[in-house]
Amino acid sequence: MRLRNVKGSRETIADNKYVVHNEESMKGKWSEFFGNTNPIHIEIGMGKGQFIMELARQNPDINYLGIEKYSSVLVHAIEKREQEEGMTNLYFIRMDAEYIENVFAENEVANIYLNFSDPWPKDRHAKRRLTSTHFFEHYDHILAPDGRVMFKTDNRPLFDFSLEQVPEAGWTLENYTYDLHHSEYNEGNIMTEYEAKFSALGTPINRLVAYRTKK
């Protein structure tokens, strides 16, 4: 799907106080950035930000970083963030997830959220999927020993692919469901904009939680 360009989005991001512009220099120093030692949770491909905004509201003792590579999408999250002046535990980064190890040190991230990621349907692009073994290797380097990767999607082929990739990457499935909203795991679920739209149409939402243990 081609994203609609938002005029002035790059300029808005460049001047915004809620966007971290020197993210690579913060590697290993995110606790200093937030001014506390609270756990750090990240959402990769956060879209318009509804999910991570609500997480930050509900959990003031957790620090959140929303990662989005498209300026035209990130500006919508910024608009929401600017309505929450009193919130001190949420910032954004505009970057490609491929370079995630340049931004976070070993064990620096407590949890990773992946919501409705690009399915990259062509086989030759499988490595680009955020639940490929390639990306799980990246997550392995930045995630704390007891950390989790939580993934939601309405795309069944992508979900089936992900279920195969987790053990192949040396990780373990803690739980998974093909219909989150009618499962025991739905309690406390926060919906993204996309999730709310398609769930209302009757589309089942798949979710998995994966973990690994540092050797």
What are these regions (language model features)?
Residues M1-I40, Q50-R57, E79-E106:
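S-adenosyl-L-methionine
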Residues I44-K48:
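Class I SAM-dependent methyltransferase "Motif I" SAM/SAH-binding loop
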Residues Y70:
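Conserved SAM/SAH-binding beta-strand->alpha-helix loop
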Residues N102-N111, F116:
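A short acidic, Gly/Pro-enriched loop at the edge of an enzyme's catalytic core
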Residues T131-P145:
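A short glycine-rich, Lys/Arg-flanked "PGG" loop and its adjoining helix->strand segment in the class I
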Residues D146-T153:
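Conserved beta-strand signature within the Rossmann-like core of class I S-adenosyl-L-methionine
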Residues E164, A169-K215:
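Class I S-adenosyl-L-methionine
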